[in-house]
Amino acid sequence: MSDDLRPIVPSVEEVAQLVADLVVSEWPRTEGERAVWFERHGIVTEGAELIRDEHGSESWISRDPGAPWPAVGWEVCKAEFVGFNWFLWRGLPEDVMPALAEELRARFVEIAGEPMDEKREEGDDYRFTAYWQRGGRSIDMYLHGGPVLEGRFHDQPVVQLSVDHVQRSRKAAEAAAGARVAEGRARP
């Protein structure tokens, strides 16, 4: 285990409690409702910028370096709020990340039951994905990165966490897939 004794910000409990609160709350529909909802739950979006705008979907990210949480991203499709995501704990020592991810996974099991879908890679290349649904919302968690293995890509460990409105997320994915098919047909 690492000797780095910096506090974990946000803590596993803070992340789990916020996600639990958001999943059961009334999901915002419009940009105005989303802004109020984020503010009510302490999600900082100052300095937000549009990073993708195509096929009726927009992706936004807040890059506020003064926020206690990492940058938050969110998606809007056809003017409806779909969901949000974080990349948590980037920069922490590699030997700390798996335990944090497993602790967060355990909290999500308490919140939403066992994952509907889960994939794991054990051993030196340890990582996992887990997916839950509860009340029309999804929680999608990935442990990325890890130790360098010969001939393999290495990235700094990070936990990717997305929380979406299931039906709106499905519509956004279908709209994007349909647009890609149409673009492919339009090419000579």
Residue ranges with predicted function:
Residues 1-126, 139, 146-188:
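Short helix/turn-capping signatures at newly exposed starts of structured segments
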Residues 131-137:
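Active-site beta-strand termini and strand-to-loop segments that position acidic
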